[in-house]
Design a protein with these regions (language model features):
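Glycine- and hydrophobic-rich flexible loops that cap the catalytic core of alpha/beta enzyme folds
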Residues: 2-265, 367
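Short, solvent-exposed coil/turn linker segments
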Residues: 6-11, 405, 411, 448, ...
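Amphipathic repeat-derived elements
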Residues: 41-47, 55-60, 393-401, 408, ...
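Histidine-centered nuclease catalytic patch
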Residues: 75, 433, 445-454
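Charged, solvent-exposed alpha-helical segments that act as regulatory interaction surfaces
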Residues: 95-98, 362, 445
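Positively charged, low-complexity intrinsically disordered regions
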Residues: 109-111, 127, 433, 439, ...
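A cross-family structural signal marking well-folded subdomains
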Residues: 211-216, 220-443
Length: 454
């Protein structure tokens, strides 16, 4: 590892230089406020005649795929933002909406810092962002009608475009200010420096990364670029889509049924890392397992297994909004898909859990006990089933009925009394909606997941 102070603009410069934002990095997410602050700092640099402005650190590592290509481990937000600023400056000069004392300034910036005109089309840009951002960036080099308006890159490019038009600085002053941005460049060596450990230390506060971000970095970061892209496309991106991008919660549920305890949401990354290392997991096999469970997660959330009876119960459980039971449902449905329990046992198990949840809700039993119950319920059931060489469903029912204290299963008498005494219109809205669904559709032959009740 080698660190040195240098001008930020030097990272974009040079023959065959191309900066790669690895697929494990999050999308570009600097806000307009961040861009405003940068531009204000550049104005201040010139107005106060300062020699330079410190702009943070950048961590980069040469890739195995190509000479001159560097992978940006940390600092992609700053690098991308300044690239957008230079592109906005170039386009305004080329459109002759602003002028420069140097008639070649636009071309000089374009060929030195933005594009390598000698490279093939797919490698021409000196910056390669992650998948969706890359498409947006390429369109910014085209006409405005081609811009990807939903992209944050486009929004910030437009901000710079308009801000430059205000001419607080001339084109020459702005470029001079950009050249004064200083960074600490930390260069890592393949095979010698652990990029993951360095990234962790730089982001130890965890303020700007979700637990899922950190897990994604962990599983992808130390892989060659082509392997990263393959793992991202074949597994991680599918996991994101299947979980509706709520990957941190999904990972917590995955860990819960594997660890048989509920990790704190802010500790999901650390728990995942320990789990992976303890089991000496092959990364691709681990991602494949996660992707498979993410498909089950999607089917649970959407009540879309394709089996009508199963989907009806899942739909009702979704009405109750009891996400706490997912650490039980995920391995249960997986067990069924592996033909380790039959369809009858699956339906029966789902209905037993449904009854358990609704009875407790009607009797106003505390919900804080449910986390621990469902963290271990599947493993408890499997253990007793194997020990007694008996069926899954009777064992599951036995475990729930014999829970004690705050975890117990309400008796018939308790449930009936609560049902008689409860003010239905004052109860939990999800439980009320569930109750109306059951009363109205008890014998309904047509199943629809989009029913609504007022």
């Amino acid at each position: 590892m080698k660190g040195s102070e240098k001008r930020l603009i030097s990272l974009y410069d040079g023959s065959n230089v191309r900066m790669i934002i690895p697929v494990y990095q999050r999308n570009y997410d600097w806000t307009r406020d961040n861009c405003r602050q940068l531009f204000d700092d550049l104005v201040s640099l010139i107005k106060n005649n300062r020699q330079n402005h410190f702009f943070g650190s950048v961590v980069e590592m040469g890739t195995q795929e190509g000479i001159g290509e560097v992978s940006i481990i940390d600092g992609q937000q700053r690098i991308t933002t300044v690239y957008l600023l230079m592109l906005a400056l170039v386009k305004l000069l080329e459109e002759e909406k602003i002028t420069s004392a140097d008639p070649q300034l636009a071309r000089r910036i374009r060929v030195s810092y933005l594009e390598d005109e000698f490279q093939p089309e797919d490698k021409k840009l000196r910056l390669k962002p992650v998948k969706n951002d890359e498409m947006a960036l390429k369109r910014l080099f085209k006409d405005e009608k081609d811009y990807l308006l939903s992209s944050n890159l486009t929004n910030n490019f437009r901000y710079f475009y308009e801000r430059i038009l205000d001419q607080e600085l001339t084109a020459d002053e702005l470029f001079k200010a950009i050249q004064k941005l200083m960074i600490i460049d930390i260069s890592l060596k393949q095979g010698e420096d652990d990029a993951q450990l360095i990234f962790e230390s730089l982001n130890s506060t965890g303020l700007d990364l979700t637990e899922a971000d950190k897990v994604r970095n962990y599983v992808l970061m130390n892989q060659p670029v082509k392997v990263q892209e393959s793992l991202y496309e074949n597994y991680w991106n599918k996991i994101e889509v299947n979980t509706n991008y709520e990957v941190s919660n999904f990972l917590r549920n995955y860990l819960t049924f594997n660890l048989k305890r509920v990790p704190k949401i802010q500790k999901v990354y650390l728990e995942f890392k320990k789990y992976s290392e303890k089991n000496d997991s092959d990364i691709e096999e681990l991602l494949s397992d996660l992707e498979r469970y993410s498909e089950i997660n999607r089917d649970i959330s959407n009540a879309s297994t394709g089996e009508r009876e199963v989907d009806e119960v899942l739909h009702r459980l979704n009405i109750l909004d009891m996400r706490v039971i997912k650490p039980f449902l995920l391995p249960l449905i997986n067990y069924w898909k592996l033909n380790k329990i039959d369809f009858k046992a699956l339906i029966g198990s789902l209905k037993v859990v449904e009854t358990f949840i609704f009875r407790r809700t009607m009797c106003s039993f505390p919900t804080n006990a449910l986390n621990k119950i469902f963290a271990t319920l599947f493993s408890e059931t499997i253990k007793l089933t194997n020990q007694g060489n008996t069926e899954f469903l009777p064992v599951l029912s036995y475990i729930l009925i014999n829970k004690a204290d705050s975890s117990r299963y309400p008796k018939d008498s308790e449930f009936l009394k609560s049902f008689d005494d409860k003010d239905i219109y004052d109860m939990n809205k999800n439980a009320r909606k569930y109750l109306f669904d059951r009363l109205e559709n008890r014998n309904c032959q047509i199943f629809c997941v989009n029913r609504s009740f007022s």
